[in-house]
Amino acid sequence: ASKYSERLCSLIIHGSIYKRDDTQKRVVLNRLNVAKMNRPTSKHTALRRWLSEDFIKKNPEIYKTIYSLLEKNDHKNFIKIYEIFVNYEDDDSMIKKINVNTLITTGENDVGSTPEMARNLSKIIKGSKFVEIKNGKHLCSIECADDVNIIFKNFIDKNNAQT
């Protein structure tokens, strides 16, 4: 999007990290170390971070499905990718080049891709809009699907109408 904004009608950034503080960096590094040692525990912990307890209780099949998808991941490749995620540093000069109507969203209760991160990201992308998904965690696109889809659809429709 920073190189080819002219090719886009709009951009949606959902559940993204931005400018982790030192505590947040330690937390994701710790998650990496746990994932290296204890695969099942890290998957269950991740799902509880991504979905509310109430949703998990009411939707055990969805929980099982997502867990089984995580189980199918190649563990060595997951660790390699997660190391990149842990060590990622934001490039503000690149981000500031984004010049398209941008919607930035995250769940109200997302502890990894926090509302504060999303708000701060929206401050450096010219003309962007931030929307916090009420009661959402990291997988609010599943748990709060109707809300997320309406927000996305309205944003896309508005921006497609302008072209």
Model-predicted regions and their roles:
Residues I98, I104-T106, D110:
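Short beta-strand/loop motif that positions the catalytic acidic residue
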Residues I12, L103-T105, V131:
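Conserved hydrophobic packing residues within short motifs/helices of P-loop NTPase cores
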Residues D22-R26, R39-K96:
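Conserved alpha/beta-hydrolase catalytic His-Asp/Glu region
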Residues A46, Y82, L121, V148, ...:
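Hydrophobic "lid"/C-terminal helical patch
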Residues G127-T163:
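Catalytic active-site module of serine/aspartate enzymes centered on a nucleophile-bearing elbow/loop
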Residues S2-R39:
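Flexible "cap/lid" loop of the alpha/beta hydrolase fold
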Residues V111-M117:
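Conserved alpha/beta-hydrolase "acid-adjacent" motif
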Residues R119-S128:
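Active-site-adjacent alpha-helix of alpha/beta-hydrolase-fold enzymes
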